[in-house]
Amino acid sequence: MSEQSICQARAAVMVYDDANKKWVPAGGSTGFSRVHIYHHTGNNTFRVVGRKIQDHQVVINCAIPKGLKYNQATQTFHQWRDARQVYGLNFGSKEDANVFASAMMHALEVLNSQETGPTLPRQNSQLPAQVQNGPSQEELEIQRRQLQEQQRQKELERERLERERMERERLERERLERERLERERLEQEQLERERQERERQERLERQERLERQERLERQERLDRERQERQERERLERLERERQERERQEQLEREQLEWERERRISSAAAPASVETPLNSVLGDSSASEPGLQAASQPAETPSQQGIVLGPLAPPPPPPLPPGPAQASVALPPPPGPPPPPPLPSTGPPPPPPPPPLPNQVPPPPPPPPAPPLPASGFFLASMSEDNRPLTGLAAAIAGAKLRKVSRMEDTSFPSGGNAIGVNSASSKTDTGRGNGPLPLGGSGLMEEMSALLARRRRIAEKGSTIETEQKEDKGEDSEPVTSKASSTSTPEPTRKPWERTNTMNGSKSPVISRRDSPRKNQIVFDNRSYDSLHRPKSTPLSQPSANGVQTEGLDYDRLKQDILDEMRKELTKLKEELIDAIRQELSKSNTA
């Protein structure tokens, strides 16, 4: 190659813009370029060529003319101009500027020396050759090579420094990148820890909130269950109280109904007795053996009032006494006497007549013992005024009654005197304001005895009293007819306690039960103490004209029917209680 590079430098090539009065980068883009000074050995010319380091774009290519003015404006910025424009080189270092400036000076010296050299031979062609002053061509070549070598070394050193700088920059960038990554990692870890801590706190708070809410709900549920249980217990207690109150009211209503019927039956009892008395007292001239014969079957009704049935509890309805109960051997405590009877339809009995002149007036008998009821169910209807004697008091009263009867038997052997004594005793007993109603037993016997004595006295007085007696018999005939019809034709469709006794509109079976024994008690009342207490083991076996045995069978059936009804009611009540308990249990289970 005819051209050789005598120098290279790293510099930014600039061109001066005359229009804008400023330096602009050559090639339109900034950046360093490799600037060489080439020497054409054949022509002995020099030129400056610059290429971009990045894309090898030629940014400068100008010849170095002879007489060029090279201006070193600063240590790193040199400039020159040719006929077209002004060039400037902004070197990267002082070494590059010095190397390029030395090569430029050497090129200018060569060009200047070449201009003066040929002219001298032409001018002095006739003169001998002279010794050239200055370095020879070989020396210049050696210097040029040395400069190139230095330039090359500097270039290598510069490249090495550039590589080191770039390596340092790369390491610095990597370090910064690592630091950035480490910092980001730490920040990420910190954020992650904070997030986890926040989530843990939120989870703990949520769990605590849920636990607190569950505790509150459990407490509310327990409170609600306790309130419901208390409310249920209160409702059950109110329901039990209501049922108890209704049961008590039902019992009171039944007791009042039974009491009302008993009062009606007790009030109708004297009217039902008048007719059998008329039939018994129709023949006033009855003989003494006839009375003795009638005393035998009348002993059982007299014991009926003394031997009592067992005392039953107040809730069930009372069982009416019958002949079957009269033969019970165990005497229970006596019940309360019934209230005084309502006035009967017949005329009131007249006062007892004065004693006859040929008779010794009997001593006043003591008040008889209160009559014993045939059943213990009268206990619920007794009052404070007519409370009966029980226990030892009843036994003492019975003993007094026996003593008086014995005295009457010894002092007054005649039947008329006994009748008078019994009449006075009956008057004394019935005249008491708080005396019990004679329903059965000795009280019923005393009532019958009083009626018999009154009939006897009326028969002894004369015809005027006999007319009154006939009127009384006429008035008493109607109840006998109604009673006979009711006893002879019982209603098969009704139960025994529902059969209607048409006398005075009452429906009590007590009146019809007592009619037959009273007829026998009237005849039996005049007998002695021994005949009163004669033991009888069996009731009447022969059916009488009044139908005693038939009534006994009716009242046995009545007793059985009442027991059956009581069992049915108790079973029904038990089922209702069981159903109510089941309903409450089902409510509590569903709640």
Curated annotation (Swiss-Prot):
Residues 442-459 are annotated as: EVH2 block B. Residues 115-146, 221-379, 405-549 are annotated as: Disordered. Its main location: cytoplasm. Keywords: Actin-binding, Cell junction, Cell projection, Coiled coil, Cytoplasm, Cytoskeleton, Phosphoprotein, Repeat, SH3-binding, Synapse. Residues 221-264 have a biased composition (Basic and acidic residues). Residues 391-411 are annotated as: EVH2 block A. Residues 115-136, 275-305, 479-491, 499-509, 538-549 have a biased composition (Polar residues). The modification Phosphoserine is found at S125, S265, S506, S508. One of its GO terms (molecular function) is actin binding. InterPro entries: PH-like_dom_sf (IPR011993), VASP_sf (IPR038023), VASP_tetra (IPR014885), WH1/EVH1_dom (IPR000697). Residues 554-588 are annotated as: EVH2 block C. It is found in: Cytoplasm; Cytoplasm, Cytoskeleton; Cell projection, Lamellipodium; Cell projection, Filopodium. NTN1-induced PKA phosphorylation on Ser-265 directly parallels the formation of filopodial protrusions. A motif (KLKR) lies at residues 400-403. GO terms for cellular component: cytoskeleton; cytosol; filopodium; focal adhesion; GABA-ergic synapse; lamellipodium; plasma membrane; postsynapse. Sequence repeats lie at residues 156-160, 161-165, 166-170, 171-175, 176-180, 181-185, 186-190, 191-195, 196-200. Residues 391-588 are annotated as: EVH2. GO terms for biological process: actin polymerization or depolymerization; actin polymerization-dependent cell motility; axon guidance; postsynaptic cytoskeleton organization. Residues 432-443 have a biased composition (Gly residues). CDD domains: EVH1_Ena_VASP-like (cd01207), WH2_hVASP-like (cd22185). Residues 311-323, 330-373 have a biased composition (Pro residues). Required to transform actin polymerization into active movement for the propulsive force of Listeria monocytogenes. Belongs to the Ena/VASP family. Homotetramer. Interacts with APBB1IP, APBB1, PFN1 and ROBO4. Isoforms, containing the polyproline-rich regions with PPLP motifs, bind the WW domain of APBB1IP. Isoforms, containing the PPSY motif, bind, in vitro, to the WW2 and WW3 domains of NEDD4 and to the WW1 domain of YAP1. Binds the SH3 domain of BAIAP2-alpha but only after the autoinhibitory region of BAIAP2-alpha has been blocked by interaction with CDC42. Interacts, via the EVH1/WH1 domain, with the Pro-rich domains from VCL, ZYX and Listeria monocytogenes actA and with TES (via LIM domains). This is Protein enabled homolog. It comes from Homo sapiens (Human).
